[in-house]
Amino acid sequence: MYKLYIAILFFFIQTISAQQLRQPFDFPILLSGNFGELRNNHFHSGIDFKTQGVEGKPIHAVQDGYVSRISVSPWGYGNGLYLTHPDGTTTVYGHLQRFAPSIARYIKTQQYEQESFNVNLFLDPDQLPVKKGEIVAYSGNTGSSGGPHLHFEVRDTESEEVLDPIEYFKEKITDTRAPKIQGILVCPQPGKGVVNGSSRKLELKPVTAKMRQIGASPGHET
């Protein structure tokens, strides 16, 4: 019963948190990448928002919080921004073109102090606070990005585990296409598992068949 109470409480906390987030843009949400997609060497840890094919779209803080981390690099997220929020989550904004002026000034100071363009900065809660809806950056195509978009994540601040951002925006995203299974790869654990008597991987493809109506044969009256 105790575990049930915890599960119910967690559900309501998630629901309340989801209701508190605003979308990072002021235009309709369209996705170019989903949470958990298989990439070259990892699973996609966030969602990718389309930015109407261009850079420089204002990005708003999804709720109150503070800038907890800033990364500037020619790889990965490129210009990346991390905002930590009172509800125990951290939101991540990647591939940014540039930062809001107050954030950009702080970065420039640190780059001169460290004598390096590439920086990975961690901030205290009182250094750069932000308000929900405040413009914190502008969308871009920096780092390991193949086109203008915003990479967006929601993480548990304490554990840094990634959460599915779709749960926070599902009321604003139109999805009319059902998932289609392309195949299933079964991988036996070495020395412990087999598939059809073999320890080799087995790829299963979906079986497709035409549907026919089952009923009375032609000419048979019922």
Which residues make up each language-model segment?
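Short coil/turn motifs at secondary-structure junctions
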Residues: 157-159
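Surface-exposed, glycine-biased beta-strand/turn segments
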Residues: 17-87, 97-99, 124-126, 131-132, ...
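Aromatic/His-enriched, Gly/Pro-containing loop or helix-boundary segments
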Residues: 102-132
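Histidine-centered catalytic micro-motifs
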Residues: 148-154
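Beta-strand/loop nucleic-acid-binding surfaces
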Residues: 91-104
